[in-house]
Amino acid sequence: MQLVTERLYLQSITAEDWPLFLRLYQDPEVIRYIADPLSEAAIRERFDARLPVWDKHGDQWLCLVMREKHSGEAVGITGFRPQWLPYRQAEVGYGSLPAGQGKGYGKESLRAVLDFAVNACGFHKLTATVTSGNLASRGLLESCGFQLEGTLRDNFRLAGEWRDDWLFGLLAAEFQGGK
């Protein structure tokens, strides 16, 4: 599968994308709000779970590699995972290498993913969970129309400390109205 934006190709992850996935999960800045450092075997398990052919009626991640059109360079991953079927909800997720940050690729790719999820797949609501303190992720979601729906206090243990999780949501009607 492939989505195309002004500056990016978003392509289904393949076995050849293992080096990118490993770099993302081993970069302390990329992973610092996602998980404590993981073993290579644990990262491989997450990667392998994203390789099967995606189905909107399933429960696995649609994982798309973000590639710059002009260079072909992979700069991150983005996608979503169906949840709460048959109520047509999905959770979005993304991560960019430092070289891909600060260029607007996150917003560009997330808007394409939202368009696909809402208009091609018929999802009613998209959600995101962000660890408190991750202001870049929060800003990205809010710039795409997501609203803060609540805070789960001391919900996630990271670096030996309990952290709050911010819950964000975007209804299909809000996304379509904001295009």
Go through the PLM ranges and name each one.
Residues 29-51:
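Conserved GNAT-fold acetyl-CoA-binding loop/helix
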Residues 38-39, 62, 133:
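Short, conserved alpha-helical segments within structured domains
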Residues 51-65:
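A short helix-loop-beta-strand connector motif used in the catalytic cores of GNAT acetyltransferases and
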